[in-house]
Amino acid sequence: NKGCATCSIGIACLVDGPIPDFECAGATGLGLWG
């Protein structure tokens, strides 16, 4: 998913679409936040 690439940025993922990118945000978030 190209959205996943955007997820790497962080906030951009949520702004673009928190629902479809939530999975990516969660995976990337765990690495960044945890």
From Swiss-Prot:
GO terms for cellular component: extracellular region. It is found in: Secreted. GO terms for biological process: defense response to bacterium; killing of cells of another organism. Keywords: Antibiotic, Antimicrobial, Bacteriocin, D-amino acid, Secreted, Thioether bond. It comes from the Bacteria. Alpha-amino of Asn-1 is covalently linked with the carboxyl of Gly-34 to form a cyclopeptide. Thioether cross-links are formed between cysteines and the alpha-carbons of other amino acids, Cys-7 to Thr-28 and Cys-13 to Phe-22. In forming this cross-link, Thr-28 is converted to D-amino acid. Pfam families: Subtilosin_A (PF11420). There is a cross-link at C7-T28 (2-cysteinyl-D-allo-threonine (Cys-Thr)). InterPro entries: Subtilosin_A (IPR021539). Transmembrane segments: none annotated. There is a cross-link at N1-G34 (Cyclopeptide (Asn-Gly)). There is a cross-link at C13-F22 (2-cysteinyl-L-phenylalanine (Cys-Phe)). Belongs to the bacteriocin class V family. Has bactericidal activity against some Gram-positive bacteria. This is Subtilosin-A. It comes from Cytobacillus firmus.
